[in-house]
């Protein structure tokens, strides 16, 4: 997308200038897109995914026009550090483009003998065995990559970092309130239509409860990081001062934020998503340990805050809003051997799938059409996706591209940990916590589900990953 002299110019070190009104409007438009993405079935329909990419491309094109006019630029320090993960995303999209590029049969046979054998037409062939699906996959992937770039380009001040986190909290709270209301009222509506799946559990405007759970965890990560940045660092002496502190808390925006987090936890429990809930509390605990380890000194306030999330959310809120049913579902794993074995066999057969296309993959988005060729008699039914993001990326894109995506996430996680170790600014440290928690959630939940194949969740995830580089390299109280 950007190379050569343009790479140097886009982050040219110039005298800091104030944000132009147009650039501010683009930031607002990008935030609106982040809120829109989960609404039309999590953008997991071709029309919705295409519209999402079109909206992101329009904002990116407008930003480039401002850049060419000298009225916008990526912060130099952010660009210097974040261009490597951006290039990794671009390289993956270039690989998907190659998958749908017609090549001589001899080249296809050398790169992917199985693909060459399975093609039924003559002439030049493609590495992808489903050209249309991979074409849409590329379109969607370009949109996700644009989302990562727009974060780097537009979230360029302390105020915008805070606003970005607040936008995710707002969107997550809205999804949570809507999903919980639909369950508790019995209306059972999704996105302007009656739900045809997930009745009796919270799904919001998503179709799958596990994907709403994943989205809520990312929004909870943003809210938790925001709340951590607001922890008081003043020492309190005496019961009168402590009472005044509690009264100030009840009247402060911090208390409202805590209520929003509670609403999201209620909806998370109401999804009855086993791994969604397990991944949330595991990610919260592990990210908390990372934050405590990264801190310059042990913080009892942070320990108390994290403990309050566990105690209040799990015992009190969960008890009122169906934690017992979630626990029954977790305990009922032994009685659902068939379901668990179906996941085992899916993973088993997907490994055979990967062995057939180890280097090139079968083409982005082609899993639904190729997997039946490897599906044995132990696994019945039709599957659009593997219930394992790691395996699906490997099967469709090939192992090298899948490892590149793992490297992309690992780089962002490392940067998030460094933010918590080296930065003093509480907001940026809170943002680093949010990224760390989101990555740990994805690492856990991706073993049993396909959250990252859902456009809204993938866009939200890469936006949070970009925040690691933003919070690690923005100067304090300064912006371009």
Where are these regions (language model features)?
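Juxtamembrane membrane-water interface segments that cap and precede transmembrane helices
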Residues: 39, 116-131, 193-205, 331, ...
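Peri-membrane helix termini and adjoining interfacial loops of integral membrane proteins
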Residues: 107-123, 185-198, 234-240, 324-329, ...
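Cytoplasmic juxtamembrane interface segments
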Residues: 65-81, 148-161, 322-345
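Helix-loop-helix transmembrane hairpins and adjacent membrane-interface loops
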Residues: 66-98, 103-105
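Alpha-helical transmembrane segments of multi-pass inner-membrane proteins
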Residues: 2-40, 50-65, 89-93, 97-100, ...
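TM-adjacent membrane-interface loops and short helices in multi-pass inner/ER membrane proteins
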Residues: 99, 208, 335, 344-384, ...
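Short, charged juxtamembrane terminal tails flanking transmembrane helices
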Residues: 476-480
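Aromatic-rich transmembrane-lumenal/periplasmic boundary elements in polytopic membrane proteins
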Residues: 96, 100-116, 130-133, 178-192, ...
């Amino acid at each position: 997308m950007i190379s050569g002299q343009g790479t140097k110019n886009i982050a040219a070190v110039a005298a800091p200038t104030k944000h132009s009104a147009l650039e501010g409007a683009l930031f607002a438009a990008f935030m609106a897109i982040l809120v829109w993405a989960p609404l039309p079935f999590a953008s997991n329909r071709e029309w919705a995914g295409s519209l999402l990419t079109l909206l992101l491309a329009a904002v990116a094109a407008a930003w480039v026009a401002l850049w060419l006019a000298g009225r916008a630029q990526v912060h130099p320090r952010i660009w210097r550090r974040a261009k490597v993960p951006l290039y990794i995303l671009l390289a993956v999209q270039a690989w998907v483009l190659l998958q749908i590029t017609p090549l001589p049969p001899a080249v296809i046979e050398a790169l992917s003998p199985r693909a060459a054998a399975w093609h039924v037409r003559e002439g030049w062939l493609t590495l992808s065995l489903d050209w249309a699906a991979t074409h849409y996959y590329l379109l969607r992937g370009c949109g996700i990559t644009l989302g990562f770039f727009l974060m780097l380009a537009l979230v360029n001040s302390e105020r915008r970092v805070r606003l970005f986190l607040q936008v995710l909290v707002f969107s997550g709270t809205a999804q949570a309130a809507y999903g919980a209301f639909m369950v508790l009222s019995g209306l059972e509506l999704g996105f302007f239509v009656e739900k045809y799946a997930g009745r009796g559990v919270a799904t919001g405007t998503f179709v799958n409860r596990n994907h709403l759970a994943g989205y809520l965890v990312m929004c909870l990560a943003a809210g938790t990081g925001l709340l951590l940045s607001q922890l008081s660092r003043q020492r309190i002496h005496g019961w009168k001062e402590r009472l005044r502190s509690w009264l100030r808390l009840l009247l402060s925006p911090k208390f409202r934020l805590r209520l929003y987090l509670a609403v999201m936890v209620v909806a998370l429990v109401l999804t009855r998503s086993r791994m969604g809930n397990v991944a949330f509390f595991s990610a919260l605990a592990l990210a908390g340990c990372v934050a405590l380890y990264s801190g310059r000194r042990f913080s009892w306030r942070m320990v108390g805050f994290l403990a309050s999330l566990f105690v209040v959310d799990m015992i009190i809120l969960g008890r009122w809003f169906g934690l017992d049913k979630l626990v029954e579902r977790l305990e009922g794993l032994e009685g659902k051997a068939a379901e668990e074995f179906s996941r085992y066999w899916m993973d088993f057969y997907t490994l055979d799938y990967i062995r057939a296309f180890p280097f090139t993959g079968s083409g982005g988005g082609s899993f639904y059409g190729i997997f039946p060729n490897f599906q044995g008699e132990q696994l019945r039914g039709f599957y659009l996706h593997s219930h394992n993001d790691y395996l699906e990326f490997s099967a469709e894109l090939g192992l090298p591209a899948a490892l590149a995506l793992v490297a992309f996430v690992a780089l962002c996680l490392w940067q998030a940990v460094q933010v918590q170790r080296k930065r003093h600014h509480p907001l940026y440290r809170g943002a680093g916590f949010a990224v760390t928690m989101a990555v740990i959630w994805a690492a856990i939940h991706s073993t049993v589900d396909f959250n990252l194949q859902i456009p809204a969740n993938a866009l939200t995830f890469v936006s949070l990953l970009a925040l690691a580089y933003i919070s690690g390299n923005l100067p304090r109280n300064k912006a371009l």
